[in-house]
C-alpha cells in the first residue's frame, strides 16, 4: 500500500501523525478467542504516562458472534480504557484489514484460549512490517521472536489435569464446546504487568518499532511465504516416500 493510502486510513479514524495506533485482528470473542481485559487494562495504564497531545487508538478488526458479545465489548471498553480511542471494524473485508495493518504502529494479540493453534494474524502483521505484541501461546511462540520481531508476554495456567472436571462435563454433553472453551479459558491469565512494560517500551521508542517491524517483515517473507511453505511440504512428501 502507498503512503497516501496509509495516511488516508489513519485520517479516516482520526489518528494524528503523533498518535499511536494498535490493531487486533481476529474473532471478537472474549470466551473463545482472547479476553479483552488485559489489553484494555494495559493500554489504559500506559496512556497515563503519554504526552497529553498523543492519543492511543485501538482498532479491533473482526466480527461478533452475537449482539450480546458486541454490547459487552463496547460497554467494557468505555469502563476499562476510557482514555483509549476504540474502533471496531469488519474483519471480513480483507483489503481493509490489510490496509489497516500496514497503517498501524503495533499489532497486539493477547490470546488466552486453548482453541488457538498456529495463529495466522501475527504473520500477517509481520508481513505488513509492523512489530507484534503477543502472548507466548501455542503457535505464537513459533512466529514472533521475543525482542526481535516484537515482544511475547507470559501466560499462566493451572497445572496439568486441573480441567478434567470440565472435560468430563463436555464429553458427557452436560456442557457444549462453546461453554467448555469459555470455562477453561478462565483458568488462564495473561501477565498484565509485563504487558504494560512492553507496551510502554514499544510506544515510546519509534526506532525500536521500526527495527522490529523490519525484522518481522523479513521473517514473514523468508519463513512463511507460500513459496517457502510449499517447498517444505514437498520436502515432507519426499521424506515420507523414502520411509514408505
Give a label for each model feature:
Residues 91-94, 99-104:
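Short alpha-helical donor nucleotide-sugar binding micro-motif in glycosyltransferases
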Residues 194, 201, 208-222:
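A short, well-ordered alpha-helix in the C-terminal region of glycosyltransferases
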Residues 131-134, 144, 151-152:
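Short hydrophobic beta-strand element within catalytic cores of glycosyltransferases
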Residues 102-115, 130:
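Acidic donor-binding loop of glycosyltransferase active sites
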Residues 119-122, 140:
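Short glycine/serine-rich donor-binding loops of glycosyltransferases
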